[in-house]
Amino acid sequence: MKISAVAFDFGGVMTTSTMPQRVIALAKEKGIDWNVFVNGFNAHRLDYDAGHITLGEMYALIWGDAGFSVSDETTAAFMKADDESWCYRNERTLEWMKALKERGFKIGILTNMAPKFAREHFRSRFADFIALADAMVISGDEGMVKPQREIYDLLRSRINLPAEELCFIDDVEKNVNGSRAAGWNAIRFATNDQVEADFEKFIL
């Protein structure tokens, strides 16, 4: 199979966290039921990632849905913990991206990410990842999110390759399925060892 480019998700692939770990710890500390919290988180996160609402507005919606009365101070603590949770770099992924680049593969980045986080954290803390990319799409800059078909088509157009020559790496099944629906190849990320081994089998 001819693969010419590998596109990477951010959270859970370029980072070591798959959910905001500091938020989980803070919810426990504040006595907020995690199951109730996560329902609201999942309901409103994509609107935040698309740039339609701010992080503060997202948390206000979470509290409102759950009927929680939460102080501004506690909300600010959750917002800080949320941002910090996504800043744990996966250095193994960085080294793999470098190795793929050296082998002649184009590199893409396709992520659901709010504009503010991209400006204040991603572009500085992950600058060496970004430097490897031949094309990048950040959902909040475009007003669309994975798994919408249009966001995959946008990265494909920017990297200027046919869909069948692209391989997408993401830890979320619905996003992997979305890329396949757009005609891409895809591998769901679980661990670095797994995804690297699966990729080598994939390109045989």
Where are these regions (language model features)?
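Conserved Lys-Pro-Asp/Glu-containing loop-to-beta segment of HAD-superfamily phosphomonoesterases
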Residues: V145-E173
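Generic structural signal for small/hydrophobic residues in well-ordered secondary structure
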Residues: D9-G12, G51, L100, I109, ...
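Metal-dependent phosphoesterase signature
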Residues: Y48-L94
